[in-house]
């Protein structure tokens, strides 16, 4: 049985871990959201989230975006390559409803899977 938990090992926690991804990322994006990824040597994917107050004013909207992104990652973690991902929310992401945001994330996860197979 596949575990769909979201333990601490699957998160980017320190600034150096984020910097590692920002140095040489593979990018996949939409006008509202970008996912940066970089291969890691851990054997499993990890995720970090950046939702700036400048782009999404209200705290409950930022929390909704982060919650939906974490849930999308949690459900797809076993299909994703061993990469560190940073999800960057841009202006306009707060205008997406839950379904549109989930569909955009699914499309970007699939694109990263293709990019990882190609490299």
From Swiss-Prot:
Under which name does UniProt file this protein? Ribonuclease P protein component
Instruction: Enumerate the Gene3D superfamilies for this protein.
Output: 3.30.230.10
Organism name: Escherichia coli O157:H7
Q: What is its EC number?
A: 3.1.26.5
What keywords would UniProt list here? Endonuclease, Hydrolase, Nuclease, RNA-binding, tRNA processing
* Gene that specifies this protein: rnpA
The GO cellular component terms are: ribonuclease P complex
Any one of the GO BP annotations: tRNA 5'-leader removal
Protein family according to the UniProt entry:
Belongs to the RnpA family.
| Source superkingdom | Bacteria
Give the catalysed reaction(s), semicolon-separated: Endonucleolytic cleavage of RNA, removing 5'-extranucleotides from tRNA precursor
Q: Which NCBIfam families match?
A: rnpA
InterPro entries listed in its UniProt record? Ribosomal_Su5_D2-typ_SF, Ribsml_uS5_D2-typ_fold_subgr, RNase_P, RNase_P_CS
- What PANTHER family does the record point to? RIBONUCLEASE P PROTEIN COMPONENT (PTHR33992:SF1)
> How does this polypeptide assemble, per the annotation?
Consists of a catalytic RNA component (M1 or rnpB) and a protein subunit.
State what this protein does. Answer: RNaseP catalyzes the removal of the 5'-leader sequence from pre-tRNA to produce the mature 5'-terminus. It can also cleave other RNA substrates such as 4.5S RNA. The protein component plays an auxiliary but essential role in vivo by binding to the 5'-leader sequence and broadening the substrate specificity of the ribozyme.
Record GO terms (molecular function): 3'-tRNA processing endoribonuclease activity; ribonuclease P activity; tRNA binding
Q: A Pfam family name for this chain?
A: Ribonuclease_P
């Amino acid at each position: 049985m596949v575990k769909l938990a979201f333990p601490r090992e699957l998160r980017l926690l320190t600034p150096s871990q984020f910097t590692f991804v920002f140095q040489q990322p593979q990018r996949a994006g939409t006008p509202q959201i970008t996912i940066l990824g970089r291969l890691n040597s851990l054997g499993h994917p990890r995720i970090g989230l950046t939702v700036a107050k400048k782009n999404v004013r209200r705290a409950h909207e930022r929390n909704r975006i982060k919650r939906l992104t974490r849930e999308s990652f949690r459900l797809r973690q076993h299909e994703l390559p061993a990469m560190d991902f940073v999800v960057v929310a841009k202006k306009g992401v707060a205008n997406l409803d839950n379904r549109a945001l989930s569909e955009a994330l699914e499309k970007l996860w699939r694109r990263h899977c293709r990019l990882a197979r190609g490299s």
